[in-house]
Amino acid sequence: HVVCRRQRQMCIRDSHYTYAFLGDGCLMEGISHEACSFAGTHKLNKLICFYDQNGISIDGKIDNWFTDDTAKRFEAYNWHVVEIDGHDFQQINKAIELAKSETSRPTIICCKTKIGFGSPAKEGTSNVHGSPLGDEEILSTRKNLKWEFNKFEVPSSVYKDFDFKVQGQILEDNWQIIVDEYSAKHPDLYKDFKRQVAGQLPKDYERKFTEFVDKISVDDEKIA
């Protein structure tokens, strides 16, 4: 369930966000219209999408086959639209906070980016779309970005920023408190929640499905 069933005051189903990462090629496909229109119609405010808007596909610049105004398109779907510089970390963080504050619409964060950022010869071209830079261009890119570390060396400052063990344990402990309280107050819903997480169908699914098939097989009503 995307929104808390029966609007319980405490609901572990509704305490998370779903993040998706999209590219120009993704939004060209027809299925994107169906899915995004559905999300907007049903006000799935826990859905946050990052659109990597670099204007490049594997066949080159998209100008000749994809000229949609994506921001207006998603506004028409009833989405919350945030446009940012996709290389600006502060803008990214602020956009995520704005998305989380939205309570009635899904959010798309349009990140204007340059594919192959930092590569002197291949930045902004389809040559870096799924293809390696090559040894010479790697050296040029490292020099251009002033990256002085050796191959496969991760700076200690990066390790520090990504070390989420302590904070992660705190969040896990807080989450467990919520789960315990929820399971005590709503044991039936919690049991159903665990079933869904385990990917299991309800015990009466087969019976209900058979009854449904039997009904429509003898019903005169035409179903498309």
At which residue positions do the language-model features occur?
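Hydrophobic/aromatic ligand-binding patch that stacks against planar heteroaromatic rings
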Residues: 2, 38, 73
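Conserved catalytic motifs of the protein kinase core domain
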Residues: 7, 15-17, 46
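A structural signal for short coil/turn segments at secondary-structure junctions
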Residues: 13, 42-43, 102-103
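Boundary/activation segment at the start of structured domains
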Residues: 40-48
